[in-house]
Amino acid sequence: MQIAITRGVSAGIAACELTHLERQPIDLPRARAQHRAYEEALARAGCRVESQPALDDLPDSVFVEDVAIVLDEIAIVTRPGADSRRPETAHIAPALSNYRRVTFIQPPGTLDGGDVLRLGRRIFVGRSGRSDESGIEQLRAVVWPYGYTVTAVPISGCLHLKSAVTEAAAGAVLVNPAWVDAAAFGAVRAIEIDPEEPYAANGLLVGGRLIYPEAFPRTRQRLEAAGIGIEPVDVSELQKAEGAVTCCSLVFSE
């Protein structure tokens, strides 16, 4: 059984952190409706969705991916690079402790889960404004005993590594080559986004299908031409908060 931990949309999401986007008004009821539809897509993909309550004083807390990394053997609670997000970690640890032994990234290191891409036993971490060398080295020390390798990857022009690349299918990644070099990921099939859709590289592979934003029809055509099944979702309000489909859940085997 796949577990998907999510968290409700904060009433304060309009005050979210923004790095590469201009602030726009966010329709809170619509954002919450889109989030519920996203949870339904996870359930259709075979996940048992465990929705945590919204944290109205923590604007970015719907983006649970950034505060933890869950492997088969252990869960790592991160130390987010944005000061405003660090209180979120105390709220995710209890939910994870039901399933895994939990460890924590320690100061002064910083690490955002959005910078962490796992491909089998290989873990890639974006060198970003949110994840530093200390955080990456701490992650490496935690996962090495379980047989994982950790490789730091340069990125440019985007918030997180998974803004630039995500797993699209077994042995394939969806990538924006302007933001990351696909060669960093070795012998995988690289499907490039349509250059007119720079934010289109983020999809969530669950149950053999890719949960994918409706906002990127050109790139969706490329994915479908590559034989990848798409589960479309509308996350337009969450995208205004610099979020994407991987950001809104932690998916792992029970």
Describe every region a protein language model picked out.
Residues 1-254:
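The feature marks the mature, well-folded catalytic cores of soluble enzymes
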